[in-house]
Amino acid sequence: MINIFSFSHLIEPKKIFKPVIKNYSKTIAGLDFMSVSADKYEALRFRLMVIERLKLLKRMFSYKELSSITGVPETVLCRYIKGSIIPSYDQAERIWHALNKMVDIRKLILEKLEVIGEGFVDLSQIISDPYMLQYIAQHVYMLFAGKRVTKVLAPAVNGIPFATAIALTFQVPLVIARRTRNINVIDYIEGSYIGPSADIITFYVPKRMIKRKDEVLIVDDIVRTGKTLRTMVKIVERVKAIISGAVILVGIGEAWKKEINIPVDVIVQLPEALK
């Protein structure tokens, strides 16, 4: 039997991709194609993304179950997944919409994360699963479709797998803000905050990695106080680049949001009591 969860919060492709396609040369992450070529590229990319989503869900559901929810014959789904054929754009839209009703991404994440001891959140089952990361990255791509993103910025170290999956999906470079300097790099952008023990925590990004013309998506796996996120914002602002937004895999509490002056999408929100 198919488990169908509510997935109404995810924006439908018809509401995202068609407007993006019309003005694609102005909106897609850093690509400078002629408008006609860009339209075809974006449409094809979406059709291929639907196939990838089918492949990911095939690990959890049978062809019979996928056929039941999408209305596509099992034999055709099999050919999509094996790469023999690809769906038309309209068919891809219908499949995407149907699959969104099939799985609640928040429920999937909650099933894999663990709360250990006094509020410690273990995401190891998520960040070590490349299929799960790819599925979440596609969700993030849909959230930010229509916004220009040229770089993904993430603080080291735990959020790197999550940020890598997102950068690959957006097809843009990944910039890592590290806690230590590389002796081979001379110029850095720095950002600091005061830690829980009154120690100063500093992040470093090579200056050449973020330019003024960039539009940056900030990514992190867990946010508790918002201090690291605010530091990432400062780093981008120091080079006068544009912040496209921020996406957080797990947010604990909501008080920290009051001090963040950029759009933030939190995929899974946990209660303040976990701090």
Label each region the model flagged:
Residues 149-156:
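Short glycine-rich phosphate-binding loop at a beta-alpha junction
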Residues 172-216:
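Short, glycine/charge-rich flexible loops or terminal/linker lids adjacent to PRPP-binding catalytic cores
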